């Protein structure tokens, strides 16, 4: 059972510490999501019929072709273009049946994770439960609802108080409450 999420594993000692456990649990958990990690960790990803342990085929092969190839030694895509593609892909994959739906869920999981707010992490867990909860956890699928990732501005102001925590202009900053200083 369970849904396992693995991120940011690059250092060899860390990989070695969990690699055997991931391999043992991979085929016995509801889903194993590995993202932004070393290739030897990424290969453990299994979400429905989508796995990363084999040669790309179907939707993944198509996505690699769409990505393009480097020209004149320049990178194929800047970080900004890659993020734009990451946001666009789930909208495209929504209309392709089969394994593409699991690939879509993988890219949505990346979006939730990269946005990194409490709300997005809760939405990510809801999505994964709705899609992959099995066995005694299958009843949770009826409760969990897929909600799109909350998108935040690339550049913004973080504020602890206020309706929105991240705003992209000074107009969205909450007015401070009137406080008078005290002495002693």
PLM region spans:
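An N-terminal assembly and electron-transfer interface module characteristic of large anaerobic redox
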Residues: 2-184
């Amino acid at each position: 059972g369970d849904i396992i999420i693995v991120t940011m594993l690059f250092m060899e000692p860390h990989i070695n510490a969990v690699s055997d456990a991931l391999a043992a649990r991979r085929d016995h958990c509801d889903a194993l999501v590995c993202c932004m990690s070393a290739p030897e960790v990424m290969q453990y990803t299994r979400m429905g019929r989508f796995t990363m342990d084999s040669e790309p085929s179907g939707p993944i092969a198509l996505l690699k072709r769409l990505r393009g190839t480097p020209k004149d030694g320049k990178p194929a895509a800047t970080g900004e273009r890659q993020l734009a593609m990451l946001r666009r892909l789930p909208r495209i994959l929504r209309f392709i049946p089969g394994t593409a739906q699991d690939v879509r869920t993988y890219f949505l999981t990346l979006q939730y994770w990269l946005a990194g707010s409490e709300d997005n992490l809760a939405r990510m867990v809801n999505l994964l439960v709705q899609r992959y909860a099995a066995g005694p956890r299958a009843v949770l699928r009826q409760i969990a609802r897929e909600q799109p990732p909350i998108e935040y501005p690339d550049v913004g102001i973080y504020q602890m108080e206020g309706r929105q925590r991240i705003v992209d202009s000074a107009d969205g900053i909450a007015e401070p409450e009137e406080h008078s200083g005290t002495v002693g």
